[in-house]
């Protein structure tokens, strides 16, 4: 039974607009072979706990009084699960019928596989079917073959990623033909089936990465330990764009992104690299601010990003007050330059 092998862990934060349809999509994908779902909530105020409590079936609610971040919420679900595999996902994701079973089987065939995903397509509306040739008419999929670095982040803030989305030195991903087995450096943050023992071995997600870069950090630590990550065309994963943080990005989430990227750099590339990246990215943002003010009359200003860098510098590389909503998880040091940040293990 799938329930003996896989637990679905989904993180919610005021997600009632998508949660009812999420449960239906899981039911469709696991028809006749249901598995347990753990709803890990980060202090929602939209009645999600009552809604889950009224549902029948293999459902459990793991609530938290405040928002502790995406990775910290996933950690609660991974710890509570008792199956050898866990599916970590957003509530705006759908997987084709039988897909969970296919991914579990795929990983069972590869003992060193720590994580696997189907081929992911990002859409505005859920398709009526999961026909691969319709969702991927060119037969190509975008997968990660590298990790974020100062060049990819400079291209992000300068806009070069938008103009040249397929240049390998500007982005950490490439497009390749869809096939049964694609070894990758990281999985898409919206979905992945993971070997629970491997996650426990490396210490789960780093709670200091409140939002963004948590999957990059996890993937890098898994591969450092000798584990493998894969994307397979055995199943299709649909992510509905327009409902998550990337689509509703606000000034708050943009500042969280800044802090997470520098913490990731500090953790894996060292202090000197991170400070060099800090000033290089700040310089690019400065040029962007000047252009918007002088040429576009202040429209689309990046001044809040520029000001964050100044405040962080005055803090000695700390996280400026207000960056992490509600202060985040108790006892967690979010300062990106903190000397206690360990290197990858």
Where in the sequence are the language-model features?
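Acidic donor-binding/catalytic loop of UDP-sugar-dependent glycosyltransferases
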Residues: 47, 71, 93-106
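Short aromatic/hydrophobic "clamp" motif used to bind/position activated sugar donors
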Residues: 86
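A short, conserved alpha-helix in the catalytic core of glycosyltransferases
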Residues: 177-179, 185-236
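Non-catalytic, C-terminal membrane-associated alpha-helical segments of glycosyltransferases
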Residues: 252-260, 271-345
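Glycine-rich, basic loop-to-helix element that forms the pyrophosphate-binding segment
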Residues: 63-81
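Short, well-formed alpha-helical segments that are part of the catalytic scaffolds
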Residues: 15-30
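A conserved acidic beta->alpha catalytic loop
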Residues: 25, 41-49, 66
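Acidic/His-rich active-site region of diverse nucleotide-sugar glycosyltransferases
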Residues: 105-202
């Amino acid at each position: 039974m799938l329930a003996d092998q896989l637990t679905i862990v989904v993180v919610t934060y005021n997600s009632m607009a998508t949660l009812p349809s999420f449960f239906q999509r899981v039911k469709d994908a696991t028809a006749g072979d249901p598995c347990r779902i753990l709803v890990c909530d980060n202090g929602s105020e939209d009645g999600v706990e009552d809604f889950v409590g009224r549902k029948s079936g293999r459902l459990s609610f793991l609530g938290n009084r405040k928002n502790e971040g995406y990775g910290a919420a996933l950690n609660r679900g991974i710890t509570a699960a008792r199956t050898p595999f866990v599916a970590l996902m957003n509530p705006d994701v759908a997987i084709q019928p039988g897909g969970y079973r296919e991914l579990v089987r795929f990983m069972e065939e590869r003992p060193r596989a720590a994580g696997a995903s189907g081929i992911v397509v990002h859409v505005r509306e859920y398709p009526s079917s999961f026909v691969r040739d319709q969702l991927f008419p060119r037969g190509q999929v975008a997968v990660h073959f590298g990790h974020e670095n100062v060049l990819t982040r400079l291209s992000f803030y300068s806009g070069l990623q938008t103009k040249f989305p397929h240049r390998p030195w500007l982005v950490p991903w490439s497009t390749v033909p869809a096939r049964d087995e694609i070894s990758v450096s990281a999985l898409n943050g919206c979905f992945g089936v993971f070997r629970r023992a491997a996650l426990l071995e490396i210490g789960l997600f780093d709670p200091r990465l409140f939002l963004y870069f948590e999957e990059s950090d996890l993937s890098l630590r898994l591969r450092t330990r000798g584990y493998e990550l894969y994307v397979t065309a055995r199943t299709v994963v649909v992510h509905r764009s327009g409902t998550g943080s990337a689509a509703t990005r606000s000034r708050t989430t943009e500042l969280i992104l800044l802090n997470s990227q520098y913490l990731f750099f500090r953790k894996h590339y060292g202090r000197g690299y991170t400070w060099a990246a800090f000033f290089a990215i700040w310089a690019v943002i400065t040029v962007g601010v000047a252009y918007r003010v002088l040429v576009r009359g202040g429209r689309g200003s990046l001044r809040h990003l520029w000001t964050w860098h100044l405040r962080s510098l005055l803090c000695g590389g700390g996280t400026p007050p207000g960056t992490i909503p509600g202060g985040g998880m108790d006892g967690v040091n979010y300062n990106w330059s903190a000397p206690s940040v360990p290197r990858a293990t």
